[in-house]
């Protein structure tokens, strides 16, 4: 009789059950201490970089976010990749023509850290219109991890969101909505250089407050009121409530600016003007200068 093996594997990714021990105060205190060790320099554009500008970082960050969204990466991948990028730029001068290679490499490493099935080098090269080769990406990977001293388990705002939600006496339905909106705010903050100066815990807390404010959620015990929630989260992360409010206001201003920019991009007149400009300037199909990247 022919023996056959029965394969019981499924395509869905297996996930661990939530562990309450990982959400206790001792773990949160350790995370608040650890976030200081993986913070990038807030002045690397002035002190380290000679060619790369904040506007170039914005372009590459937006491209990285779109790649992560299209590939349905885990929510943690993009903020972690941006942490790698900012820390590398804090240490090493980078030519503007190599910034997209660095961004792809950061996604490559972050995907390995956070995903069961990580992004491949070949797939990331395709997203650059094959302007880089897999061999270049692997070489940059070695340089990246060495410059970061293999300290790759950096804290990101996503790591704190679950801790905050676990301490909020709210219904699970509300928590799911808040979590989704807060994750969107975290990704948006990662694209803006102004938030480098804020620790991940503050970005996470500000995102949760902004999510609750934007959703206009109400609770029977009034826990979700603006001032009460702000005071509560400021005590959790041990910061001044005014600093947390300032961060939350920055997040809301960034959202408003992004929505305004999206509306302008959808304006037919603006699109026609952009097409006329593209006709006047003959650009290469694969931009070698990051400022020429058309997101």
UniProtKB/Swiss-Prot annotation:
Consequence when changing residue 287 to A/L/S: Reduced interaction with the DCX(AMBRA1) complex, and subsequent ubiquitination and degradation by the proteasome
Question: What are the disulfide bonds?
Answer: none
**Start and end of every Cyclin N-terminal domain?**
28-152
For this record, the Gene Ontology CC terms, alphabetical, are:
bicellular tight junction; cyclin D1-CDK4 complex; cyclin D1-CDK6 complex; cyclin-dependent protein kinase holoenzyme complex; cytoplasm; cytosol; microtubule organizing center; nuclear membrane
Q: What's a BP term from Gene Ontology annotated to this protein?
A: Wnt signaling pathway
Q: Where, subcellularly, is it found?
A: Nucleus; Cytoplasm; Nucleus membrane
What job does the chain carry out? Regulatory component of the cyclin D1-CDK4 (DC) complex that phosphorylates and inhibits members of the retinoblastoma (RB) protein family including RB1 and regulates the cell-cycle during G(1)/S transition. Phosphorylation of RB1 allows dissociation of the transcription factor E2F from the RB/E2F complex and the subsequent transcription of E2F target genes which are responsible for the progression through the G(1) phase. Hypophosphorylates RB1 in early G(1) phase. Cyclin D-CDK4 complexes are major integrators of various mitogenenic and antimitogenic signals.
Q: Which PANTHER family match?
A: CYCLINS (PTHR10177)
Q: Which protein family is it in?
A: Belongs to the cyclin family. Cyclin D subfamily.
Protein's name according to its UniProt entry: G1/S-specific cyclin-D1
């Amino acid at each position: 009789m022919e023996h056959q093996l029965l394969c019981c594997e499924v395509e869905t990714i297996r996930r661990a059950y939530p562990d309450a021990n990982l959400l206790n105060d001792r773990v949160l205190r350790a995370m608040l201490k650890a976030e200081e060790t993986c913070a990038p320099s807030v002045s690397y554009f002035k002190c380290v970089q000679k060619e790369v500008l904040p506007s170039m970082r914005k372009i590459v960050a937006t491209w990285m976010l779109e790649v992560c969204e299209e590939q349905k990466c885990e929510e943690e991948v993009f903020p972690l990749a941006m942490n790698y990028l900012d820390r590398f730029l804090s240490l090493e001068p980078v030519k503007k023509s190599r910034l997209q290679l660095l961004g792809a490499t950061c996604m490559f490493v972050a995907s390995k850290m956070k995903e069961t099935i990580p992004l491949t080098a070949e797939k990331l090269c395709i997203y650059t219109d094959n302007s880089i080769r897999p061999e270049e990406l692997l070489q940059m990977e070695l340089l990246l991890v060495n410059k970061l001293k293999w300290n790759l388990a950096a804290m990101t705002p996503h790591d704190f969101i679950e801790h905050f939600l676990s301490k909020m006496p709210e219904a699970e339905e509300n928590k799911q909505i808040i979590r989704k909106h807060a994750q969107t705010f975290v990704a948006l903050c990662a694209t803006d250089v102004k938030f480098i100066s804020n620790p991940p815990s503050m970005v996470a807390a500000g995102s949760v407050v902004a999510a609750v404010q934007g959703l206009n959620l109400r609770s029977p015990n009034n826990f979700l009121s603006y001032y009460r929630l702000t005071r509560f989260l400021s005590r959790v992360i041990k910061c001044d409530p005014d600093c947390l409010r300032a961060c939350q206001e920055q997040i809301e201003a960034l959202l408003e600016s992004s929505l305004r920019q999206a509306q302008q991009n959808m304006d037919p007149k603006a699109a026609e003007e952009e097409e006329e400009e593209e006709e006047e300037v003959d650009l290469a199909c694969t931009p070698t200068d990051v400022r020429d990247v058309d997101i």
